[in-house]
């Protein structure tokens, strides 16, 4: 009986305490009908920012260990979640930061990164899951910040191959080495680009020639020549791998600037994956300046060392894109590469040749892509040279060619073909190959002229 009498009194006390607890927590203010961001506070938040309850202003997020879940509590910050009324990190494993320190979890690293941003402007990023290895250097040191060449090599090396050309002696059955060089993989199925002189020989000895390709991982394959252009010194060969291969992508050599860093990689003296670095001396060195009388190509000149065996290997920019094929060394510090835009043209021409009755066309000009450095050079020689930012500079018109007969002159600037603006020479070359007639818009001095040119078919 006595217990029953005490029960109503106990319930009354509990109800009173609940009311007092609710009274201590101020009621949430109603959200305004219109959000006025000018009235939002500008707090400094070590835990980051989150939208407020009305989704109007940014307020400080609750940090790890702070209460959450109640009507007036701020949402938990980035990578945190509300667990039993307290903000906890979603991940519990330790991580290694780029500052060389081990953090208890991802959230602790992110908090340190926000503090570092406020102090030095350099964030701390996650390097790996788990503790930092012993003896790890500060990853913000110059060795780690400026080792960009190592990053490029790590990216491109698996797609660079060593190529050897042998002659199978008909009597003794021995392989007689004829040449060796490098190449790079262009397709996962085994298409490789190299120099024509690496995979062909002028040897008059009798016997069957064989091509052997060795990958970075040591796998070796017999290769066959798919397409070859000895004048341009470009060739493609094919292997049949057992699995997909790493590949390199072609960059845009017309965008190269003098002074730009480049990396050359190849197999000089059969020493695979030998790396040299340098800068672009000029992106358009006329082949005739190198004593190549029949050349219609502008080469990339670099001081990256290219030796015997480097031929056919890639010259890449710091993005790991192929911007040339290592081809020729004149002297120490003076080497040359075939531009990637010419490789693209070669691949396109031979693809067309395989899919249709293909005929080569030409209009008879030697040309250079307009670049700021070229305009500066031409203005120095001729102050009246027009101020142009893009187009094709006609360096020379071949006598009795379609261009000469159509009225094109040395020094003209071709700005459009069939109404399309020209950004580089490859676009004009593509139009010559694929279109039966060309309407060229030309800038000559201060005059804009139109010329109709019919490309000539070369059998």
From Swiss-Prot:
Report the enzyme's class at the first EC level.
hydrolase
| UniProt entry keywords in alphabetical sequence | Disulfide bond, Hydrolase, Protease, Secreted, Serine protease, Signal
Molecular function in Gene Ontology: identical protein binding; serine-type endopeptidase activity; serine-type peptidase activity
SUPFAM superfamilies attached to this UniProt entry = Growth factor receptor domain (SSF57184), Kazal-type serine protease inhibitors (SSF100895), PDZ domain-like (SSF50156), Trypsin-like serine proteases (SSF50494)
Q: Name one GO biological process term.
A: proteolysis
Location of region: Serine protease: 181-347
Q: Which residues form the IGFBP N-terminal domain?
A: 27-90
Q: What is its EC number?
A: 3.4.21.-
What are the annotated disulfide bridges?
A: 31-54, 35-56, 40-57, 45-60, 68-82, 76-87, 89-107, 96-132
Q: What induces it?
A: Up-regulated during early pregnancy coinciding with placentation. Also up-regulated in joint cartilage affected by arthritis.
Q: Which SMART domains match?
A: IB, KAZAL, PDZ
**Span of the signal peptide:** 1-23
Single GO cellular component annotation? extracellular region
Tree of life domain: Eukaryota
Task: Tell me where it resides.
Answer: Secreted
**Residues in the active site?**
197, 233, 311
Which parts pass through the membrane?
Answer: none
Record-linked PROSITE patterns: IGFBP_N_2, KAZAL_2, PDZ
SUBUNIT field? Homotrimer. Interacts with MYH9. Interacts with TGFB1; the interaction inhibits TGFB-mediated signaling. Interacts with BMP4; the interaction inhibits BMP4-mediated signaling. Interacts with TGFB2 and GDF5.
Job of this protein: Serine protease that cleaves beta-casein/CSN2 as well as several extracellular matrix (ECM) proteoglycans such as decorin/DCN, biglycan/BGN and fibronectin/FN1. Inhibits signaling mediated by TGF-beta family proteins possibly indirectly by degradation of these ECM proteoglycans. May act as a tumor suppressor. Negatively regulates, in vitro, trophoblast invasion during placental development and may be involved in the development of the placenta in vivo. May also have a role in ovarian development, granulosa cell differentiation and luteinization.
Family under the similarity heading: Belongs to the peptidase S1C family.
Protein name as it appears in the record: Serine protease HTRA3
- Which organism is this protein's natural source? Mus musculus
């Amino acid at each position: 009986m006595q217990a029953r009498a005490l029960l109503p009194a106990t319930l009354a006390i509990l109800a009173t305490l609940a009311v007092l607890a609710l009274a201590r927590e101020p009621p949430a203010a109603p959200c305004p009908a219109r959000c006025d961001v000018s009235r939002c506070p500008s707090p400094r938040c070590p835990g980051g920012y989150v939208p407020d309850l009305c989704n109007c202003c940014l307020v400080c997020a609750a940090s790890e260990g702070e209460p959450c879940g109640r009507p007036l509590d701020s949402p938990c910050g980035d990578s945190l979640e509300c667990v039993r009324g307290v903000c906890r990190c979603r991940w519990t494993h330790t991580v290694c930061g780029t500052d060389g320190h081990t953090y208890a979890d991802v959230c602790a690293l992110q908090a340190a990164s926000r503090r570092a941003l406020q102090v030095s402007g350099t964030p701390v990023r996650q390097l790996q899951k788990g503790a930092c290895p012993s003896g790890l250097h500060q990853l913000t040191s110059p060795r780690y910040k400026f080792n960009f060449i190592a990053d490029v090599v790590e990216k491109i090396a698996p797609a660079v191959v060593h190529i050897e050309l042998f002659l199978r002696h008909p009597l003794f059955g021995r392989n007689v080495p004829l040449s060796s060089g490098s190449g790079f993989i262009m397709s996962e199925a085994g298409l490789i680009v190299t120099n024509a002189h690496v995979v062909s020989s002028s040897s008059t000895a009798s016997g069957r020639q064989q091509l052997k390709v060795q990958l970075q991982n040591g796998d070796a394959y017999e290769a066959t020549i798919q397409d070859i252009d000895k004048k341009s010194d470009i060739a493609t060969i094919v292997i049949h791998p057992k699995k997909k291969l790493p590949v390199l992508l072609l960059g845009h050599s017309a965008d190269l600037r003098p002074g730009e860093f480049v990396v050359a990689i190849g197999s000089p003296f059969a020493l695979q994956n030998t790396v040299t670095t340098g800068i672009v001396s000029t992106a358009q060195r006329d082949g005739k300046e190198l004593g190549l009388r029949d050349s219609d190509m502008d080469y990339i000149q670099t001081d990256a060392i290219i030796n015997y065996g480097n031929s056919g290997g890639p010259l890449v920019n710091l993005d790991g894109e192929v911007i040339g094929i290592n081809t020729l060394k004149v002297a120490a510090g003076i080497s040359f590469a075939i531009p990637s835009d010419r490789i693209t043209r070669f691949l396109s021409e031979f693809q067309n040749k395989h899919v249709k009755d293909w005929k080569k066309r030409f209009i008879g000009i030697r040309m250079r892509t307009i670049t700021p450095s070229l305009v500066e050079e031409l203005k120095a020689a001729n102050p009246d040279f027009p101020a142009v930012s893009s187009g094709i500079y006609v360096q020379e018109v071949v006598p009795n060619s379609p261009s000469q007969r159509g009225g094109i002159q040395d020094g003209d600037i071709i700005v459009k073909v069939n109404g399309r603006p020209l950004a580089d020479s490859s676009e004009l070359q593509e139009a010559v190959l694929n279109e039966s007639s060309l309407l060229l818009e030309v800038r000559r001095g201060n005059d804009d002229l139109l010329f109709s040119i019919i490309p000539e078919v070369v059998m």
